Amino acid sequence: MTILFLTMVISYFGCMKAAPMKEASVRGQGSLAYPGVRTHGTLESVSGPKAGSRGLTSLADTFEHVIEELLDEDQKVRPNEENNKDADLYTSRVMLSSQVPLEPPLLFLLEEYKNYLDAANMSMRVRRHSDPARRGELSVCDSISEWVTAADKKTAVDMSGGTVTVLEKVPVSKGQLKQYFYETKCNPMGYTKEGCRGIDKRHWNSQCRTTQSYVRALTMDSKKRIGWRFIRIDTSCVCTLTIKRGR
């Protein structure tokens, strides 16, 4: 599992010339990308100039150490979602890249790796019974996730309720990078398009609906003013219920 994760991380950094987030304290403020950003460094700059000579085991240890530090730091700066109504502003669904990203956002991979570390501390029997596939678990609503560009979105709604134009390219020191958004929405071809899975239709009306959150993107308003604004994008598929009357 560790080797698989490292392969995903290496391919993630290798295939993209993407703008990195700023330090963790800035990420806690919902900042995702800014003008003048730089491209990702190489593995050498992350692990040191002699990392390759120490072999794959040393490289794996280095990545695990860095990832665990990132997860610890992320827990420190993550807002308290119960007390902060703006918690959905903190997202990692925006990427600046010269080509379509081949993997989900890095923080999504970190979350998966965190779950892997938690599972590693379980006994084999506990892991076997905690596997959703073994328990026959299914999602209440079927969803799909994919990277989309500003060319696909064209316009979006900002925090003031106004419609803004999403700019396709962002100027950086060495040229331009495209804005990509990782969107999650209800699957129109899924089995839950007629209602949520597992809901008693005798007593409830159900519907799978796409919900949105705010992310920061480079946009232009109706007065041709260009700037970084929070816009709404599709981020999840949830089940909504209404009770049937007259029963």
Curated annotation (Swiss-Prot):
GO terms for molecular function: growth factor activity; nerve growth factor receptor binding. Monomers and homodimers. Binds to NTRK2/TRKB. Can form heterodimers with other neurotrophin family members, such as NTF3 and NTF4 (in vitro), but the physiological relevance of this is not clear. BDNF precursor form: interacts with the heterodimer formed by NGFR and SORCS2. Mature BDNF has much lower affinity for the heterodimer formed by NGFR and SORCS2. Glycans are attached at N121. The gene is BDNF. Residues 19-128 form a propeptide. The record marks T57, S58 as: Cleavage. This is Neurotrophic factor BDNF precursor form. Keywords: Cleavage on pair of basic residues, Disulfide bond, Glycoprotein, Growth factor, Secreted, Signal. Its main location: secreted. It comes from the Eukaryota.
